[in-house]
Regions:
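Positively charged n-region of N-terminal signal peptides that target proteins for export
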Residues: 1-6
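Bacterial N-terminal signal peptides
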Residues: 7-18
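Active-site histidine-anchored catalytic micro-motif
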Residues: 29-31, 43, 55-61, 67, ...
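Structural motif
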Residues: 30-33, 59-62, 91-94, 107-109, ...
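Anionic-ligand-binding alpha/beta catalytic cores of soluble enzymes and soluble regulatory domains
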Residues: 151-217, 221, 226-227
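Surface-exposed interaction regions enriched in Ser/Thr/Asp/Glu
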Residues: 285-294
Length: 295
C-alpha cells in the first residue's frame, strides 16, 4: 500500500500546484473603516456616519484617518496601504479623497484576494492596496438601490453613494450586486523604492505628528545595502544631507540627535529624538530620498 499512497500524495501535490487555492471570499464582519480628507472636526464625518447607520444600524464604524491632506490622492494611497492590513478580513473600507467628485470618473468597489472591500472613487486611491493584496474583482457602483434614497448630490458622493454602498456590503449584500464588473482600476504612477549602485532611492510618504519623516524605502532595501544596526547612514531628503546612526529605538541617541529607524510597517523613518525632523529640514510629502551606508 505504501507505493500506492506515495503515488496519491504525488498527484495531490501536482494538483495543488496546478490549481492554487482560490482567493478568500468576502465575508463581512460588520466593520466599516473611513479614510477621508474631510478633516478631523468636519460635520461631513457625522453626516456620512448617519448615512451608514441609516442603511445598516448594526454597522461598527471607525476611522482610519480623516486627516489626509486635502485632494492628495497619492498621500491617501500610501496611508491606506500602511494601515489596511491591520484590520480583520471582512472589513469594508470607505476611502474618500475625491477632487473629481461629480465628474465622469467612476465609483467602484474593489474586492481583494484577502477578503477586504474598498469603496470609493476610481482615481488611484486603491493603487497600492491592489498591488499588495491582489484584485479579486472590481465592480462599478451603478446599482442605485444601494445608494441613499433621496436625491443624489453631485458634490457629496460620500454621503449619497460610498457610505450607503459600504454599509450594504457590511450588512451582507454581495459585491456582485453593486454593478457591472470592470477589468481594471485607475492606477497612480508612483515612484517605488529602488536599490542601485549602493544607494536606495525613494520618496517621503508622510510625516507624522511628531515630525518623523516616513519614506517608502523598506527594511529589505537596507539589507540589500548591507546596512545593520549601529551602522552610520548617509541620508539625503530634498536638498538636505546628513549622516545618522541606524537604531532600533529613538532613545538610543541623545535628545535632539538625528537617527534612522525602521518603523512599525517596515518603512525607513528618519527622526530626531524628542524633536521634529520635518520642521528642521522643511521637507515633506513627495520629497526625493536617498540612503546609503556612510563611508
Amino acid at each position: 500500500m505504501r507505493p500506492f499512497r506515495a503515488i496519491v500524495f504525488f498527484f495531490a501535490a501536482i494538483v495543488c500546484l496546478a490549481f492554487p487555492a482560490p482567493a478568500d471570499d468576502f465575508k463581512p464582519n460588520g466593520l466599516v473603516i473611513l479614510m477621508t480628507d474631510y478633516g478631523t472636526d468636519s460635520i461631513y464625518m457625522g453626516i456620512i456616519r448617519g448615512a451608514i447607520y441609516s442603511k445598516f444600524p448594526d454597522a461598527k464604524v471607525n476611522d482610519l484617518t480623516n486627516a489626509v491632506p486635502p485632494f492628495d490622492i497619492t498621500a491617501g494611497a500610501y496611508l491606506l496601504v500602511e494601515a489596511a492590513g491591520e484590520y480583520p478580513r471582512g472589513t469594508v473600507f470607505i476611502n474618500i479623497v475625491d477632487p473629481g467628485v461629480g465628474t465622469p470618473r467612476k465609483s467602484i468597489v474593489l474586492e481583494t484576494n484577502n477578503g477586504y472591500c474598498f469603496v470609493g472613487p476610481d482615481n488611484g486611491l486603491t493603487t497600492l492596496v491592489a498591488d499588495k493584496f491582489g484584485i479579486k474583482q472590481i465592480r462599478e457602483l451603478t446599482n442605485k438601490e444601494l445608494w441613499r434614497a433621496e436625491t443624489t448630490s453631485t458634490v457629496f458622493h460620500g454621503r449619497d453613494i460610498y457610505g450607503p454602498v459600504g454599509a450594504s456590503l457590511a450588512s451582507g449584500v454581495p459585491v456582485e450586486k453593486c454593478g457591472p464588473a470592470l477589468d481594471s482600476i485607475v492606477k497612480l504612477d508612483l515612484k517605488r523604492s529602488v536599490v542601485e549602485n549602493g544607494v536606495a532611492s525613494g520618496t517621503v510618504m508622510r510625516t507624522d505628528p511628531y515630525g518623523n519623516v516616513i519614506t517608502n524605502i523598506t527594511s529589505t532595501d537596507l539589507k540589500s545595502l548591507d546596512i545593520a544596526l549601529a551602522n552610520a547612514i548617509e541620508v539625503t531628503i530634498g536638498s538636505e544631507k546628513w549622516i545618522a546612526p541606524f537604531k532600533r529605538t529613538y532613545a538610543e541617541v541623545p535628545e535632539g540627535e538625528r537617527l534612522v529607524v525602521v518603523q512599525s510597517s517596515g518603512f525607513v523613518e528618519c527622526a530626531i529624538n524628542k524633536g521634529s525632523l520635518a520642521e528642521a529640514i522643511k521637507q515633506g510629502f513627495g520629497a526625493a530620498v536617498t540612503v546609503r551606508k556612510a563611508k
